[in-house]
A protein has these predicted regions:
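C-terminal accessory regions of radical SAM enzymes
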Residues: 31, 289-374
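Flexible, acidic/Gly-rich N-terminal and inter-domain linker regions that tether
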Residues: 1-90, 371, 377, 382-385
Length: 388
């Protein structure tokens, strides 16, 4: 048994553990563990500094989890977009491939509580329908292995999956969505990274949410992945009481770059059952992006997105930097709120075969796009541009 596997076995995971370690009332502990089971491995447990701190809040159950049962247990409609077991196909050229229901740590804000922790083991035979679907859909060029956490699989099982995917010619990119570099970095071993090298290009998306999670161990894990040729990106979830502070987020993003992890996404917390006490306002997220953009390296500025309820996918949000836009110019503000004007370039005259109506329709489409993502234009300006 490898060290990381022993640490999983030694995790806090029972009602007795919750009572003894954290002083949670036994009746509450039983209800919480029944609602969504607990797993806190010894490594991550050791990062807690005091009750209620950002590490504690992410892994120790809270009675507030039981106060929003009316919330959706599948807010992103992943199951509705699952054509075969273990596959979610939402975007045109990529698919999510759920390879296990196990994780090295059960995050209290998990959006897949309905699946995570299921004790049923997944076999290669059980994944056959998923592989067949991927083979048949030649538009899929990018597959994200998720779960649970794919790095909860043994090296041998993970390699079987990677080898099978590499036999499908149209699959160009394989991504591993894993929190292990952050919550159980002992999982990243020389043997694992040597195996991953055989199946490039492989990208890793991990999930650091707070600067305290960056330790010597997690830095080493990320370095090993990067040295093995696996670019590592980070997907942070914005959470009340964890990282809803611009200074904390800037510190995290800058420290991630130092350990060769590229900030990729900041997510608004999903509207998932048992996690609404983590949610912040959208304004808080925009404030954080304002605090990053221009004030630190562009490398440290991730995309801020909402994973839209109902399966709409990731929708980016930005502070409004466009103050005015028309056919002649665009008026912008920078990160210091200073105003600048950039002259527009006249469009080339369309070919004579393009009807006047089509020209107007195209211009109207441009106006709609810009005015729904930036500052609205005055109605007269909109009309003048569209009909010009």
């Amino acid at each position: 048994m490898e060290l990381w596997q022993q640490m999983i076995r030694d995790s806090v995971h029972t009602t007795d553990h919750l009572v003894d370690k954290f002083g949670i009332d036994r009746e509450e502990a039983e209800r919480l563990n029944e609602f969504f089971q607990v797993r806190i491995n010894p490594y991550y447990l050791g990062l807690i500094r005091e009750k209620g701190d950002p590490i504690y809040r992410q892994c120790v159950p809270d009675i507030q989890e039981l106060q929003d049962f009316d919330a959706n247990d599948d807010p992103l409609m992943e199951d509705a977009m699952s054509p075969v077991p273990n596959i979610t196909h939402r975007y045109p050229d990529r698919a999510l491939f759920l390879t296990t229901s196990q994780c090295g740590l059960y995050c209290r804000f998990c959006t897949r509580k309905r699946k995570v922790g299921n004790s049923e083991k997944i076999s290669m035979k059980g994944l056959e329908a998923a592989f067949n679907y991927l083979e048949q859909h030649t538009e899929i060029r990018d597959v994200i292995l998720s779960g649970g956490d794919p790095l909860m699989l043994t090296d041998a099982m993970l390699e079987k999956i990677l080898k099978r995917l590499r036999q499908i010619p149209h699959i160009e990119i394989i991504r591993l969505g894993s929190k292990m570099p952050c919550v159980l970095p002992q999982r990243i071993t020389p043997k694992l990274v040597e195996m991953l090298k055989r199946y490039h290009p492989i990208y890793v998306n991990t999930h650091f949410n707070h600067p305290w999670e960056i330790t010597e161990e997690s830095a080493k894990a990320c370095q090993m992945l990067a040295d093995a040729g696996c670019p590592v990106g980070n997907q942070m979830v914005l959470m009340k009481g964890v990282n809803d502070d611009p200074h904390v987020v800037r510190d995290l993003m800058q420290k991630l770059l130092k350990i060769r992890v590229r900030p990729y996404y900041i997510y608004m917390a999903d509207q998932t059952k048992g996690a609404n006490h983590f949610r912040t306002s959208i304004a808080k997220g925009l404030e954080i992006i304002e605090h990053l953009r221009g004030w630190t390296s562009g490398l440290a500025v991730p995309h801020f997105v909402i994973d839209a309820p109902g399966g709409g996918g990731k929708i980016p949000l930005l502070p409004n930097y466009v103050m005015h836009w028309d056919e002649e110019k665009i008026v912008l503000r920078n990160f210091r709120h200073k105003i600048y004007t950039y002259k527009n370039v006249a469009e080339e005259q369309p070919a004579t075969t393009v009807s006047r109506k089509k020209q107007i329709d195209r211009r109207r489409a441009i106006v709609r796009r810009l005015t729904t993502t930036t500052a609205p234009l005055p109605n007269k300006k909109v009309a003048a541009f569209a009909e010009a």
